[in-house]
Amino acid sequence: MDTARAALTRADEALAAAVREAGFSADDFKPAYRCPLCEDTGMRGGVPCRCVADAARRLRRDEINAASPLGLCQFASFEVERYSDAVEPELGISPREYMGKLLNYCRGYAAKFSQNSPNLLFMGHTGLGKTHLALAIADAVLEGGHDVLYTSAAALAAQLGREHFNYTTNDEWLAACQEADLLILDDLGTEYITPLTISVLYELINTRMLTHRPTIYTTNITDQSVFVARYTEKVASRMLGGCKMFKFFGTDQRLK
């Protein structure tokens, strides 16, 4: 055994000498791992390495940027100065002051996000910043290490319809929407309504509420009676009753 060890040692020394003579170092032959922590195995100390979460977060960012009209936004780019400083009678303060307070609320929501965070409903006319703030929350929550999924209501309804009539997909999109830590459901009211849409929407809302997974909804619908007429009292009650609602004021910011 000692003889074999000695032979291996001599072989190692000879190889090292040959490498040096060729102008290389031993480090030149080490694998170039993308992640030196787990050496590209994805596991470290019996748990998933942080590189796995980083990769998943990058993929989610790419998905959201491709699916949303604005891409991921940041709170810093939300310009409250663009809102009127004239007092809005319904508010008792100006839209600028109101939106500044709402911006601060959203910052705090994202910073303290957890399963106990409330559902949010952003309602108001087109171009008032609903999607911007929802996507800014998404960006910050992603950075906090949570899984975030974005979909427009129209895209959700279309995808769920395809899955319903394709028995090979096993409702994968619905499952993803149900399981994300935070779901952004944008532009409610633009989707094509069918009995299937109503049924699946109720299932999605109910499942997420029962499993304490927050959802942020945005919509141009500001009249609750219109909500009820469109989505049925059962769905509207489940959605509106479980949300902290914010109405957006001002004029279309995209026209300025």
In which residue ranges do the predicted regions lie?
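Loop/turn-to-beta-strand initiation segments
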Residues: 118, 146-147, 179-182, 211-217
